[in-house]
């Protein structure tokens, strides 16, 4: 069986696996990873949209991505890792840690796509009656997303005015733009991550009832970092997590949204390091 596609960012210290979000290739997180590499050896699986020739039509939920992650960890034959994941990356990491907790020293979820069961029920009903693509706002955005660009400087000027990037520095925004694009052989640039894959992942999400069932008995040290302006890991999810497992720590960052690791890379790295240092002493 072929090796799971992954990156190795280098660094010093114990192994830290980082898993990116939907539509955000690993290169988008170079600012965050730079702030972690002095303390940890950083590597990470690439989600299937970034695999050459990967098929999406037979994927009905996100569970296979956790199987991919566990296979990568098994192939590398390393000891317990620190698992860090953003958005879907957090969900994939959490599910993998629930299935094989001995492979994880700690888990850090960056604004995970973990919605309460009532919200998932609504989405699953909408999807079942065939109108999911019409009502999901991120799917509509992905479908309209521009795929090709003449140059990256004009992309930067355009993106700099978008409210979604309001808390990102110029440097982080440029890293993001470089991360989501690649040069075309005929000139110009195109998206690395296709809108078709991005849409498919949105459509097959919010089926995480197993995670809510497993939280009560989950004992891997866990930290959730959320943004106070997020539209993803909502206050009702925070409440339910705390109700099910009081050992899980939750940190809310000010002036931060769902893309907080790109908005505040140094601050997020510092929170991660402080948590892991405290856990190693306990």
Q: What role is predicted for each listed range?
A:
Residues 79-123:
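Conserved hydrolase catalytic core segment
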